[in-house]
Swiss-Prot record:
Any GO BP: protein modification process
Pfam families tied to this protein: Flavodoxin_NdrI
PANTHER family in UniProt: PROTEIN NRDI
Single GO MF descriptor: FMN binding
Species: Mycolicibacterium paratuberculosis (strain ATCC BAA-968 / K-10) (Mycobacterium paratuberculosis)
Protein name as catalogued: Protein NrdI
Function of the molecule: Probably involved in ribonucleotide reductase function.
InterPro entries reported in the protein's UniProt record: Flavoprotein-like_sf, RNR_Ib_NrdI_bac, RNR_NrdI
Length: 150
């Protein structure tokens, strides 16, 4: 991982939609595997797809929105302690549940929901996420106390 802390961790299913989006970003990223587990050592923003959808009303406690691999990753206390924000992909066909995995992770992990996009995203989405992440990490760095100020 990048020692500057400007890291992205993502999950992509076999559809590879999220993976293709991350490739277009052109920034350092670690993929949560379909099988097996990983542990991270630096703060990160999580990018994930939304599963499920089509319920009459969204329910944060209903389950099924967040991929099981991401749940396992975040159930590792060390990994969960390093999450700083979330970005979610979804399908507009899900209506109010569009990119709803971001709502779930944001609430349960107490981190900001930074952005959402549809399926593989557009070039505008890629540009917005790239610029937004750069600004987000810049702000994170500005809010960390230095050893000299302690």
């Amino acid at each position: 991982m990048d020692s500057t802390g400007r890291n992205l961790v993502y999950f992509s299913s076999v559809s590879e939609n999220t993976h293709r989006f991350v490739q277009k970003l052109g920034i350092p990223a670690i993929r949560i595997p379909l099988h097996g587990r990983i542990e991270v050592d630096h703060p990160y923003v999580l990018l994930l797809p939304t599963y499920g959808g089509g319920r009459a009303t969204p329910d944060l406690n209903a389950g099924g929105y967040v991929p099981k691999q991401v749940i396992a990753f975040l159930n590792n206390e060390h990994n969960r302690s390093l999450i700083r924000g979330v970005i979610a992909a979804g399908n507009n066909n899900f209506g109010a549940e569009f990119a709803y995995a971001g709502n779930v992770v944001s609430r349960k992990c107490g981190v900001p929901y930074l952005y959402r996009f549809e399926l593989m995203g557009t070039q505008d989405d890629v540009d917005a996420v790239r610029a937004g992440l750069a600004e987000f990490w810049k702000e994170q760095t500005c809010h960390q106390p230095s050893l000299q100020s302690l």
